Amino acid sequence: MAKKTIRDIDWSGKRALVRVDFNVPLENGQITDDTRIRAALPTIRYLLEHGAAVILMSHLGRPKNKVVESMRLAPVVARLAELLPEAKAVKGSQATTGPAAEAAARDLKPGEVLVLENTRFDPREEANDESMARELAKLGDVYVNDAFGSAHRAHASTEGVARFLPAVAGFLMEAELAALQGALENPARPFVTIIGGAKISDKIGVIENLLGKVDALLIGGGMANTFLLAQGHEMGDSLVEPDSAPIAKSLLDQAAQRGVRLMLPTDVVIADAFSADANRKVVPVGEIPPGWRALDIGPETIRAYTEVITGAQTVIWNGPMGVFELAPFAEGTRAIAQAMANCPGMTIIGGGDSVAAIEQMGLADKIRHISTGGGASLELLEGRILPGVAALNDA
């Protein structure tokens, strides 16, 4: 599904209308992590260097279709100006569409950057309202989507606007699609995926899709408990989803039929309460006493999973192996992060706690691709078409 990119456009004198993902964490009006802003810089710089005026749009937080003062993009504008000294100007607008936004866009000169106000202040954004899409399209000559993290949303700024302008991918979008789709469509083998997180119900579609593609699937986190329950193990007070046990059993059967190694924990770290100072011990999966709960994978499981990961040529990891936010139960997740860093093949991490683990351990530079979109990468792994990608012009 090759898409046109910003390299396919002659930008001289054109206005680039770029959807970016500037949904950064703020505390008291200060940005606490500017990773997402930095991720958009290669695209913005390319456009500026090639003679474009650049108009940026993004959402921030969940303002619920109204103006929320603490969710304005002013702090983002200030940070972007610091990161882009080469821009002739970095301006902010308090409008997203309408006469004020149109005037600001019209006055923008090549080499200058304009950041529109939070797209989600407008109730039409999340409704993918055609009137908003048309108003946004008035602001630019060519639409660029570089917001992979929002590509699974069909909103006015991610999907609707692409119907009314030539529409191409930015560098971040291109890199995300190349890594994730490349791994799914033509992986170097052995191809291994590691799926963690609390609930199997959130990831059934992902596991079903991957069973047709991978050589091995490693399961951890709370979702492993439901698989173990389906195998007949007593799980004590562990988080389980009894309603999903038949699905877990079916997935185990499908894996066996397809010759896929679906690996589950063989030992677990258990605790007598859900807290960092609970009593804890390591037991085989069949020996969890009543009143105790599994909160992490055990050392034997870590060894087995590490061996499979380090021997792989393509690995995708999504979701923690245990209750990563409690230090005594973070070891499994940290060990998988280390195994990923030691793997010589194509390593991809998709979203959330897995990324946090890699960054906390200072291993980010050892991973080939760290996805900026948790929800979007999950939907790609599930085999879904992302609306924000489908809307772009085919190459």
From Swiss-Prot:
Keywords tagged on the record: ATP-binding, Cytoplasm, Glycolysis, Kinase, Nucleotide-binding, Transferase
Pathway per the UniProt entry: Carbohydrate degradation; glycolysis; pyruvate from D-glyceraldehyde 3-phosphate: step 2/5
InterPro entries: Phosphoglycerate_kinase, Phosphoglycerate_kinase_N, Phosphoglycerate_kinase_sf
Broad class of enzyme this protein falls into: transferase
Gene Ontology molecular function: ADP binding; ATP binding; phosphoglycerate kinase activity
Disulfide pattern: none
Binding locations of ATP: 203, 325, 351-354
Record-listed substrate binding positions: 21-23, 36, 59-62, 120, 153
Gene3D superfamilies found in the cross-reference section: Phosphoglycerate kinase, N-terminal domain (3.40.50.1260)
Intracellular or extracellular location(s): Cytoplasm
HAMAP family found in the cross-reference section: Phosphoglyc_kinase
Description of how the protein assembles with itself and partners: Monomer.
Protein name as it appears in the record: Phosphoglycerate kinase
Organism expressing this protein natively: Roseiflexus castenholzii (strain DSM 13941 / HLO8)
